[in-house]
């Protein structure tokens, strides 16, 4: 695809890591094989500069970001400081539960919070959106949307209160 020619993607799906572990996880995802904690950040920076010089952007996506410790969030903030004279070398994208907002409101994370340029919260899905969401997930899984009746899909939506993560969990167990 087209996005791969413009972006180097780093994906951390389950970031229950301290600051140093996070540095090494990012390095591994970037293809950096080094276990020297004193060199790892400079090796990451060198890699990011090389990627930037080719015209590509590096994007670090962290899922379940509410699980990040304050130390790991500070490590991410420092990654966000890596830049050339004109450009940031890495974009950070955090996905998390509402607890992430609570964590980011902590006083010691104010510097991190000040660097957030865009924030978005998802509202619960309407019943029609919930049914369409379930249909889409089933289609993507190759199961077709006929596994559950419309009444069952609405019951799943109701039990999940329209929250996509809960819809996924309930559907998976059903």
Where are these regions (language model features)?
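Mid-core helix/loop region of P-loop NTP-binding domains shared across ATPases and GTPases
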Residues: 17-21, 33-75, 84-88, 125-130, ...
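Alpha-helical scaffold elements adjacent to nucleotide-binding pockets in ATP/GTP-utilizing enzyme cores
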Residues: 2, 21-29, 43, 71, ...
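A short beta-strand-to-loop transition that corresponds to the Sensor-1 phosphate-sensing loop
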Residues: 64, 94-99
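Conserved Rossmann-like nucleotide-binding pocket used by diverse enzymes
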Residues: 61, 96, 121
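Helix-loop-helix "sensor" segment of P-loop NTPases
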Residues: 32, 51-55, 82-84, 93, ...
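Conserved NTP-binding/hydrolysis module of P-loop NTPases
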Residues: 4-9, 17-35
